[in-house]
Structures are given as C-alpha cells and as structure tokens.
C-alpha cells in the first residue's frame, strides 16, 4: 500500500521521497515496453478487466485486444499521482481528489471502499511469519492478512514431494500445487 511504502520510508529511508519516487514517476510518464507475460496476463484476465471502464480504456484497444507486445504503455495519470505523493505524502493519496476517485471507482464497480475508508487507512507493523522450505528461510506477512499463512502452508505441504522429478509446469507438478493450495485455503 502507499501508506506502507511511506511508513517504511519515514522509519527507515535515507533518500528524500521525491528522489526515491523519481524513477517510478518517469517510468509511468515515459512508458515501458509491453512484455509477452504482461500481454498474456491481460488476455487471461480479459473478462474481468473489461468489466471496468478504466481498465478497459487503459489496457485494451478498440477491438478489445490487450495492448500489443513490444508496444509502449504510458500511464500519465499514474505519473501525476506518484508526483503528488512525492510532494505531499500520504494525504495526497488518502484524502482529496485521488481518494475520491478511488472510492467512486470502487463503489461504481460494486466495491465497498468509501472516502471514509481511504481517509482512515493506516499502515501497521505486524510480526512476520516464517518457515523453512528446502533449506531456505521464507518470511512473509503475518495476520491480519491471510496470504502469508496460506503461502507457508502450501510450501510446507509441497516440501513432501519431489518436484524436480515431476518437472517444471508438468501436469503432476500443477496437480500437486493445486492440491496443496486447496488444503492450505481450507
């Protein structure tokens, strides 16, 4: 989250915020070359992405095809948003026009985020969760978010299988991963 980034910067950062965010501002303004993977994800998620007018306009052409591989995707509004955050901090994002736009987009698309939710949001430090997986220490986010716990449970289940033998992206490996995730989410 923006609040998390700004809290980490305030507590641990050494660069001035505008200098820290300058590469992101420039990348959004100047654009980046669309990769095969990015194009694939847009095609894969097309049905849900097209339900949102903003996403539809930004990531799809008039024939509803995703932005082309090797084309340059510029995001001037994102650049301006990051510039405002660089100059005015948390308030630039969680109060005023940006917060109103996010809340309006959420509510008009069936979401639940309100302007009050935006203005009252705060980042919090939480104790991370950790496990070992095949000799590596894996550290991830702790509760209240559930994603970190599910990740660690999935890895702990998968450690019981020889994934090298079944092969990268093989039907067997994907089956093992699917079953492990299903049990971790249960």
Each model region followed by its residue ranges:
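Feature marks proteins synthesized as precursors that undergo proteolytic processing into two chains
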Residues: 1-186
